[in-house]
């Protein structure tokens, strides 16, 4: 296997940057910065590079690859200010976003760095994403990447500050949303000596094989009227596919999807986007009205999908096309193949239709997911979710100084840690449009809200209260960390 050291040119304006979430699995829209200028959206887009170890578990493999990162030091209080590490997740990392972490960095006079996840964006070790080249793509290797980079950056910072070798480290705090939120929690679990604490926002720490709770939450968040309208729409879609297949798919600009279940996965994800990212009325108001008026539900739903999911939130049909997902050439859309590999090997999160009262087609079942995994990566691929939960602890991980936050309407909260303890406080942010990463992104979570402002949350006081608790925990843990550092000198 040849290692590709040169970076791959990918020009993508990614929505949440450090916290991008992809469809099918964590469902992150690829363009949520609608009508927001690039300069206001980012704290920095200046690319920096780090030579990362390919295989941290092999003493004999010394291969390296170039890993992209960013730094923002405008608020840093030299020489002993804290360092905030923003973990980039399962997508290209185009810079450091101007969200609520920017507000926290300013408050705590922190420097900020952000590391792109291996294989994603411009941090691809190989020029081919064939299955055999993906064996180094795992959460475990990603955690080692973070540890190695953290050590490298601290040493570089010490040199800049003229601190002698062996001098004390700055206090570090880790941040992440969704999968990167899980990485933030897992990093504190596995490398407690390298961080003073972690914020795990909407952190999916529990790997799940059959994730039926996901759809149950969507139905709950939708409310009875909207749920019934969604269920009727699904039945009409399934019937329409049998009698006028291409005509139905053309309403959604999705005629390229030859496999009907792939199309039904797209239409299910489109509904999820409304609740997960704080825009429930964009879907429910027109759909419920259409049902009451006797209007065509499929046409109404397709209008929502085209006008909002595709035009504003960046939903792309080809990322549901398994022919496209089998493409091993590194492209701007490679993240979808890469995330499916992680789902198919260690994390699962298979969003299957519940047996009763489902808001998605029953064709989206376990067999569908397993067949897709085999179609993309070969017959030997299987999600080892039990091993993942044994290794990290699932939602019962035994760690300290981790803040867990979840939006009340976010279906992914059922894969997070929702019970609170003294060492690992957990907060549910309750409001009508509080979804994925509301504590960092504000409301709605898409399109982008500068500095994650809570003004447009249906109950902003709930968001602000949780944020105040976050500040108090970070302040306490950084203080304890500084005291520990001073006592060790």
Curated annotation (Swiss-Prot):
Gene3D superfamilies: alpha/beta hydrolase, Serine carboxypeptidase S28, SKS domain. Glycans are attached at residues 35, 51, 162, 253, 293, 365, 406, 419, 456. One of its GO terms (molecular function) is serine-type exopeptidase activity. Its main location: secreted. It is found in: Secreted. Coiled coil: none annotated. Belongs to the peptidase S28 family. This is Probable serine protease EDA2. It comes from Arabidopsis thaliana. The gene is EDA2.
């Amino acid at each position: 296997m040849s290692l590709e050291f040169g970076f791959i040119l990918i020009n993508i304006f990614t929505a949440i940057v450090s916290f991008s979430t992809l469809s099918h699995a964590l469902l992150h829209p690829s363009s949520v910065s609608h009508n927001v200028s690039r300069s206001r959206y980012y704290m920095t887009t200046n690319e920096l590079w780090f030579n990362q170890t390919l295989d941290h578990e092999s003493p004999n493999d010394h291969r390296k690859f170039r890993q992209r990162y960013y730094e923002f030091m405008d608020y840093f209080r030299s020489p002993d200010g804290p360092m905030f590490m923003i973990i980039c997740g399962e997508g290209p990392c185009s810079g450091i976003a101007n969200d609520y972490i920017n507000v926290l960095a300013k408050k705590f006079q922190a420097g900020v760095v952000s590391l792109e996840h291996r294989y994603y964006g411009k941090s691809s070790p190989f020029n081919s994403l064939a299955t055999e080249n993906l064996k180094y793509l795992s959460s475990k290797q990603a955690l080692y990447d973070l540890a190695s980079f953290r050590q490298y950056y601290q040493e570089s910072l010490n040199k800049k500050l003229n601190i002698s070798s062996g001098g004390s480290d700055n206090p570090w705090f880790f941040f992440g949303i969704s999968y990167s939120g899980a990485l933030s929690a897992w990093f504190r679990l596995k490398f407690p000596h390298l961080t003073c604490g972690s914020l795990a926002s909407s952190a999916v720490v529990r790997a799940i094989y059959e994730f039926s709770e996901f759809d149950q939450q969507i139905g709950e968040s939708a409310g009875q009227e909207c749920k019934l309208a969604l269920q009727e729409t699904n039945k009409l879609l399934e019937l329409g596919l049998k009698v006028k297949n291409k005509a139905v798919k053309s309403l959604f600009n999705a005629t390229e999807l030859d496999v009907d279940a792939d199309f039904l996965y797209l239409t299910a994800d489109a509904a999820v986007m409304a609740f997960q990212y704080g825009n429930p009325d964009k879907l429910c108001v027109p759909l419920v009205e259409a049902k009451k008026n006797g209007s065509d539900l499929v046409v109404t739903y397709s209008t929502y999908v085209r006008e909002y999911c595709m035009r504003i939130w960046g939903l792309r049909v080809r990322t549901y096309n398994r022919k496209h997902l089998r493409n091993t050439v590194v492209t701007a859309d490679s993240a979808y193949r890469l995330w499916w590999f992680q789902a198919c090997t260690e994390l699962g999160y298979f969003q299957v239709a519940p047996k009763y009262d489902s808001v998605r087609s029953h064709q989206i079942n376990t067999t569908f997911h397993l067949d897709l995994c085999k179609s993309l990566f070969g017959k030997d691929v299987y999600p080892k979710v039990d091993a993942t939960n044994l290794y990290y602890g699932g939602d019962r991980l035994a760690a300290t100084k981790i803040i867990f936050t979840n939006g009340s309407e976010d279906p992914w909260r059922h894969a997070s840690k929702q019970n609170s303890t003294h060492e690992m406080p957990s907060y549910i942010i309750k409001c009508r449009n509080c979804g994925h990463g509301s504590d960092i992104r504000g409301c709605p979570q898409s399109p982008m809200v500068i500095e994650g402002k809570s003004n447009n949350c249906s109950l902003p006081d709930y968001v602000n209260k949780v944020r105040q608790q976050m500040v108090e925990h970070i302040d306490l843990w950084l203080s304890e960390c500084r005291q520990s550092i001073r006592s060790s000198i």
